């Protein structure tokens, strides 16, 4: 599986990253190979004068260890390209992200990018709709979190869901933004994606959710035979 992650990450960097770019760095195991490839190209001199914006403390630490030049969204608000992984992707390039806990920063950096590229292996591709392979995360305030969840359960598309407050090592997981994550589990593919997103986001106390709709420009999907499938956003 790691070999598939490496193939698709290297291809994304080689095909889309150029010198003098501001680059958004996603979070997760596949993105590690993006860092590795950027580092290789910088050290070889094939890539020059780039700065990168990490979407999590974890990515920041890994990038610093490699010596990759970093900046902030405050200093570089217009990002040329962001490369990130995903938990699920449908054929319209809509996503479920955030099972690693960095969904808010990932979404903010992606929305600030001219080009948002998703990478992953074919196990992430969901041809029958989103929400069926695992948690759909929602980041919420710690204050009044039980009331926030109560209000979320009133949303018609969430009524049949089960949920869990995310924990790590037996303790409630705290995001880089000092919030909680509540993971919702669907029994059928999410209906009315846009309406569901709107209602979740409008719930007081919700910071953001892991449903990314109409944000991805290109998806690179590595297949088990070592080839890479390229999916492009459809423009109407």
From Swiss-Prot:
Pathway: Carbohydrate degradation; pentose phosphate pathway; D-ribose 5-phosphate from D-ribulose 5-phosphate (non-oxidative stage): step 1/1. Substrate binds at residues 27-30, 84-87, 97-100, 124. It comes from Plasmodium falciparum (isolate 3D7). PANTHER family: RIBOSE-5-PHOSPHATE ISOMERASE 3, CHLOROPLASTIC-RELATED. It is an enzyme of class 5 (isomerase). Homodimer. Its EC number is 5.3.1.6. It catalyses: aldehydo-D-ribose 5-phosphate = D-ribulose 5-phosphate. Belongs to the ribose 5-phosphate isomerase family. GO terms for molecular function: ribose-5-phosphate isomerase activity. It comes from the Eukaryota. The keyword Isomerase applies. The active site is at 106 (proton acceptor). Keywords: Isomerase. InterPro entries: NagB/RpiA_transferase-like, Ribose-5P_isomerase, Ribose5P_isomerase_type_A. This is Ribose-5-phosphate isomerase. GO terms for biological process: pentose-phosphate shunt, non-oxidative branch. The keyword Methyltransferase does not apply. Gene3D superfamilies: 3.30.70.260, 3.40.50.1360. Involved in the first step of the non-oxidative branch of the pentose phosphate pathway. It catalyzes the reversible conversion of ribose-5-phosphate to ribulose 5-phosphate.
